[in-house]
Amino acid sequence: MAFLKKSLFLVLFLGLVSLSICDEEKRQDEDDDDDDDEEKRGVFDIIKDAGKQLVAHATGKIAEKV
């Protein structure tokens, strides 16, 4: 009976260790993905701001002609 308990505890311990390692790798992968998303947002913000300035400049030119 003691042998079965020790074996069971060993299996559970090794399972918990492997789960924690997998969780750490998953968090690292998610952090890497977050960095990519931030870069994409940064580029989109630059394009959006340039578009706003272009529209403002164009509407200013149209208002001057009228």
Swiss-Prot record:
The UniProt keyword set, sorted, is:
Amidation, Amphibian defense peptide, Cleavage on pair of basic residues, Secreted, Signal
Question: What is the reported tissue distribution?
Answer: Expressed by the skin glands.
Tell me, what is an example of a GO biological process annotation in this record?
Answer: defense response
Instruction: Give the chief site where it resides.
Output: secreted
Q: Which domain of life is it from?
A: Eukaryota
Q: Which residues form the propeptide?
A: 23-39
- Modified positions (Valine amide) are V66
Instruction: Write down a Pfam family by its short name.
Output: Antimicrobial15
Which region is the signal sequence? 1-22
Q: Where in the cell is it found?
A: Secreted
Recorded hits in InterPro entries, A to Z, give: Antimicrobial15, Frog_antimicrobial_propeptide, FSAP
**GO cellular component labels:** extracellular region
**Free-text function comment from the UniProt entry:** Has no antibacterial activity against Gram-negative bacteria E.coli ATCC 25922, S.pneumoniae ATCC 700603 and S.choleraesuis ATCC 14028 or against Gram-positive bacterium S.aureus ATCC 29313. Shows no hemolytic activity and no cytotoxicity.
**Family of the protein in this entry:** Belongs to the frog skin active peptide (FSAP) family. Ocellatin subfamily.
| Name of the protein in question | Ocellatin-PT2
Q: Lineage, please? A: Eukaryota, Metazoa, Chordata, Craniata, Vertebrata
